[in-house]
């Protein structure tokens, strides 16, 4: 049996929802899992940044795959893993989340699917360190994750109005999550905490209602974006261009450097072009795409090997 797993890219934070809010996007990495007839680990990769993918046990997909069986207290089976990449690495689009989710979902499928999505979410979050990418990557849609009184994850499925279109501009340079976290302060003021709490609430309400004026106000943040902007050359110019082209707002996607604008359907192409040409004018190689929310999350199917 061979299992194919398709995992969507994600955009985390959505401005003020730092480490708790994220949405799945219609850009996918694909993974194929099968028992290795050789009895040894076999990994092949193709597509975007494929040359950067580890071909041994350090591979993040394999590490998640192995973690599943270790939690089950079962031996890790020999694996034949094929990877096809469309989500660029270290760009703020949840590439590591696609790897972790794929590894867990593939392992669960080969084991006969003993785990629920809730169990997969818990281990994925443990491996990733935060839920804002792995949860929407697995479940789809826009998701808000928070701890309950027993320190378990409470995950809310949030409405995303069809009048809000995600537009991403992806520059050709990497920015690791670790580097993006190093620039953040260790403490915040009460006023900044209150500011973000209010704006997360407004993001949730505006996304559900389709109210663009609310969304334009809601996407502001004081916890991470002001500090990370300096790591992204051309940020201010691209933000200005997107707003002038009609975007409701622009935020850093995840840890960056990808920038996410949210637009009305009729302005999406103008926003895409404005972001693309403005960033290219700074000398960077950039691509820009109009995407949609991936409502169904990770997809899995069994295939017959040729």
From Swiss-Prot:
It is an enzyme of class 2 (transferase). PANTHER family: HOMOSERINE KINASE (PTHR20861:SF1), HOMOSERINE/4-DIPHOSPHOCYTIDYL-2-C-METHYL-D-ERYTHRITOL KINASE (PTHR20861). InterPro entries: GHMP_kinase_C_dom, GHMP_kinase_C_sf, GHMP_kinase_N_dom, GHMP_knse_ATP-bd_CS, Homoserine_kinase, Ribosomal_Su5_D2-typ_SF, Ribsml_uS5_D2-typ_fold_subgr. Catalyzes the ATP-dependent phosphorylation of L-homoserine to L-homoserine phosphate. Its main location: cytoplasm. The keyword Hydrolase does not apply. Pathway: Amino-acid biosynthesis; L-threonine biosynthesis; L-threonine from L-aspartate: step 4/5. PROSITE patterns: GHMP_KINASES_ATP (PS00627). GO terms for cellular component: cytoplasm. ATP binds at residues 88-98. Belongs to the GHMP kinase family. Homoserine kinase subfamily. It catalyses: L-homoserine + ATP = O-phospho-L-homoserine + ADP + H(+). Its EC number is 2.7.1.39. Keywords: Amino-acid biosynthesis, ATP-binding, Cytoplasm, Kinase, Nucleotide-binding, Threonine biosynthesis, Transferase. It comes from the Bacteria. The gene is thrB. It comes from Synechococcus elongatus (strain ATCC 33912 / PCC 7942 / FACHB-805) (Anacystis nidulans R2). GO terms for biological process: threonine biosynthetic process. The keyword Kinase applies. GO terms for molecular function: ATP binding; homoserine kinase activity. It holds the Pfam family GHMP_kinases_C. Transmembrane segments: none annotated. This is Homoserine kinase. It is found in: Cytoplasm.
